[in-house]
Amino acid sequence: MELNNVANIGEYAFSGCSGLKSLSILKANNVDASTFNGCDAIETLVLPYEWGVDFKMTLSGTTQLRTLYIGENTASIPDKTFVNNKNLFEVYSNVTTPPSIGTATFGSETYSYATLYVPQGSVDAYKAATGWSKFEDIQELPFQIVVKDKKVSVDRTKSILVSASVTPASSTSSPVKWYSLNDEIATTTTDGVVTGMAEGGVTILAYCDGITAPMKVIVKKFDGVEDVMADDPTELSEFDVYNLQGIRVRTNCTKEQLSELSHGIYILVSPQGRKKVII
């Protein structure tokens, strides 16, 4: 179950879902201890980007947990959090600097038999860190996500297209998806159309198979008059069409098919760039 766009998950929301085997809660910042109570069949878990004080999910009952992904902005994990997860044999950490953990955060079976995957260039740091050094097998992540720009800016109410790639490209067939950590500042579609909503800064995440890479988005006040094209909409042969809410309304659209759209303002996106048009 992918809940990567959900920030707050209510009490007992999924309590007793004994058939739930995969869970991804990348954006969650408020999870009660009761939210996933009784979900003891979970085998794969993608933790939130940041393990904050409001993340109170009880993990001791997830005895079938085999694969764990740790969020990139995690500073610490409480001791004995995974001590009862005796089947946990794959741990993926997105954190370059090892989070603070205790010597019993994980169980002895995990320390002895699991593989710990860490970001490129971080193996030695994990081998020297308290708790992490108990892992007998520490390797680099099988791939990394490379974002085209670490920091971008967009005017409020306007949109830009961001991109990222996986290297090595052959390591996964899954697409890179995008998520905003604060939709009040900027929203993003999963394929990277970012729309400014209010002035400020926000982190958006490129995500693929539990691995993440951040991008900083600065939303600026738009002071000028918006230039909306009303003549020749595009020089491109095909493009995806989005409305101003960032929702994709047409894929592989040709110039001739634009006339089929309802009247309004749209964003035309292709690998070569983007244009805003009025229909």
Please place each PLM-identified region on the residue numbering.
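Short, surface-exposed beta-strand/beta-hairpin micro-motifs centered on an aromatic residue
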Residues: 1, 192-196, 256-258
